[in-house]
Design a protein with these regions (language model features):
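NAD(P)+-binding Rossmann beta1-loop-alpha1 motif at the extreme N-terminus of oxidoreductases
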Residues: 1-62, 192
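Residue-level signature of catalytic and energy-coupling elements of molecular machines
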Residues: 4, 90, 145
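Class I S-adenosyl-L-methionine
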Residues: 17-20, 37-40, 70, 104-108, ...
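A generic structural signal for alpha->beta connector loops
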Residues: 23-25, 42-43, 86, 111, ...
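A general structural signal for well-ordered alpha-helical segments in protein cores
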Residues: 36, 56, 66-70, 76, ...
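Rossmann-like NAD(P)(H) cofactor-binding subdomain of soluble oxidoreductases
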Residues: 49-53, 58-61, 65-131
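Rossmann-fold dinucleotide-binding core
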Residues: 94-177
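C-terminal substrate-binding/catalytic lobe of Rossmann-fold NAD(P)-dependent dehydrogenases
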Residues: 184-185, 189-196
Length: 196
């Protein structure tokens, strides 16, 4: 499958590497050009998201926040400039569900499908799948996504319609951060009363 991948940070770079190693034809792009250097041997380095998306069947987005996702997908040099009807966009970033709906409206008018596919780290090596991926979208689109997402996922689940994957990820984050805060408060309480 022809795949574009935008965003080669600490999560995106290993995801992209595993996509290429699983036999997909990969084009990559990052706002920091040096981030692409490690993938030059296995991927085409693109000058923009639009360049990366030329001929792509699936485009993956793994950038920092809602604003960056919108720019990568819908901006002047965004994915929509090159993706053809029938293509699929996967959002791996953790963003607001309202932002997903905004993207869906813009992409649907162009015949491009959208699946939210946020990831949660499980384990990490350079050669093995290392994340749990939560998918939200229509069943046919999710089935298409599995062919790519399976390259880097230890587990992947279809959580429901568009937004359900993101809701599951945000809920997971809430539980994780709540446990961290409770743990810190419990430690302070114990220390205050002299518990070693």
């Amino acid at each position: 499958m022809r795949v574009a991948f935008v965003g080669l940070g600490s999560m995106g770079a290993p995801q992209a590497r595993l996509i290429a190693r699983n036999g997909h034809e990969l084009a990559v792009c990052d706002a920091v050009p040096a981030a692409c250097d490690a993938l030059r041997a296995i991927a085409r380095v693109a000058s923009s998201p639009a360049d990366a998306a030329k001929g792509a069947e699936v485009a993956c987005v793994c950038v920092r926040d809602d604003e960056q996702v919108i720019e990568v997908v819908l901006g002047g040099a965004g994915l929509v400039e090159s993706l053809a009807p029938g293509a699929l966009v996967l959002i791996h970033s953790t963003i607001g569900i309202d932002t997903l709906y905004r993207l869906q409206a813009a992409l649907k008018s162009r015949g491009i499908a959208l699946v939210d596919a946020p990831v949660s780290r499980t384990r990490r090596t350079d050669d093995e799948a290392f994340v749990f991926t939560m998918l939200g979208g229509e069943s046919g689109d999710v089935d298409q996504a599995r062919a790519v997402v399976g390259a880097f996922s230890t587990d992947l689940d279809h959580m429901g319609p568009l937004g359900a994957g993101m809701a599951a990820k945000i809920a997971n984050n809430l539980v994780t951060w709540t446990h961290l805060v409770i743990g810190a408060q419990a430690t302070l309480l114990a220390a205050h009363y002299g518990v070693p």
